[in-house]
Amino acid sequence: MAVNGASSSGLIVSFGEMLIDFVPTVSGVSLAEAPGFLKAPGGAPANVAIAVTRLGGRSAFVGKLGDDEFGHMLAGILKTNGVQADGINFDKGARTALAFVTLRADGEREFMFYRNPSADMLLTPAELNLDLIRSAKVFHYGSISLIVEPCRAAHMKAMEVAKEAGALLSYDPNLRLPLWPSAEEAKKQIKSIWDSADVIKVSDVELEFLTGSNKIDDESAMSLWHPNLKLLLVTLGEKGCNYYTKKFHGTVGGFHVKTVDTTGAGDSFVGALLTKIVDDQTILADEARLKEVLRFSCACGAITTTKKGAIPALPTASEALTLLKGGA
């Protein structure tokens, strides 16, 4: 499957947070026991934006960074990776967000965040680049931007403007419970914008959280369905993903790779999916083509787990195709 050339493909605008992850140099130890940390750029919406450009698509990032060395470093990383940066604001009074990430021996993660408040939380509706948002064919976002005002109001305004301009709305809640005042508030706010999205991707863990069920099955997933939804995805880690549309549902298998760090795997998956559908949304109604796209997306997610950090591990289309052909 050829990826559209960057010049011809529609724009995918990603809204939300970008931060610095501090990742221990040794896996399987607590933060206190870690001998040292490597800094890695992160933040799910930013990861998605770079995943798109790495695959040959066009993307832009909308959000706020601290007017500090880390903030300007992150903006530079977006630009270096071909992401349009004219939706970025800098805050002189607040720092860029930081997260310390514990890598367990199996590559899964635990988080400790420093953001009280961080610059991303202070984005206001008046600071939004509305022309950029209106130019989006796909508008992608998470839920971390819903936690506090004024960022929540900016999120709602951006979504409304994108929807009015005809964009496909893509939602990956990206649950980070330590950032929320309570689990109840997280569930309430994540669900508060549920019915606006055209495409929703949740992980198996998020499915359990949102439904209150410990079953990862079709009945549980379909309890999250809403009438305007075009595609609901439940990612299953190395087992692939389940997909649901109005007309059909099924499973796409995953890839067995040597997992080092799962950071960014879901973002890589989403970026691949959006890159493939931005110029041809009829794929969402064609099961055979959708399965092909989801297999490609699963390959991208799998490759991302084979290296430390999200952005350095995001694959090119040729790397994903190599894995699809069994050459990796």
UniProtKB/Swiss-Prot annotation:
<dbReference type="GO" id="GO:0019252">
    <property type="term" value="P:starch biosynthetic process"/>
</dbReference>
<dbReference type="InterPro" id="IPR002173">
    <property type="entry name" value="Carboh/pur_kinase_PfkB_CS"/>
</dbReference>
<comment type="pathway">
    <text>Glycan biosynthesis; starch biosynthesis.</text>
</comment>
<dbReference type="InterPro" id="IPR050306">
    <property type="entry name" value="PfkB_Carbo_kinase"/>
</dbReference>
<keyword id="KW-0808">Transferase</keyword>
<keyword id="KW-0119">Carbohydrate metabolism</keyword>
<dbReference type="GO" id="GO:0005829">
    <property type="term" value="C:cytosol"/>
</dbReference>
<keyword id="KW-0067">ATP-binding</keyword>
<dbReference type="Pfam" id="PF00294">
    <property type="entry name" value="PfkB"/>
</dbReference>
<keyword id="KW-0547">Nucleotide-binding</keyword>
<keyword id="KW-0418">Kinase</keyword>
<dbReference type="InterPro" id="IPR002139">
    <property type="entry name" value="Ribo/fructo_kinase"/>
</dbReference>
<comment type="function">
    <text>May play an important role in maintaining the flux of carbon towards starch formation.</text>
</comment>
<dbReference type="GO" id="GO:0006000">
    <property type="term" value="P:fructose metabolic process"/>
</dbReference>
<comment type="similarity">
    <text>Belongs to the carbohydrate kinase PfkB family.</text>
</comment>
<dbReference type="GO" id="GO:0005524">
    <property type="term" value="F:ATP binding"/>
</dbReference>
<dbReference type="InterPro" id="IPR029056">
    <property type="entry name" value="Ribokinase-like"/>
</dbReference>
<dbReference type="InterPro" id="IPR011611">
    <property type="entry name" value="PfkB_dom"/>
</dbReference>
<dbReference type="GO" id="GO:0008865">
    <property type="term" value="F:fructokinase activity"/>
</dbReference>
<protein>
    <recommendedName>
        <fullName>Fructokinase-2</fullName>
        <ecNumber>2.7.1.4</ecNumber>
    </recommendedName>
</protein>
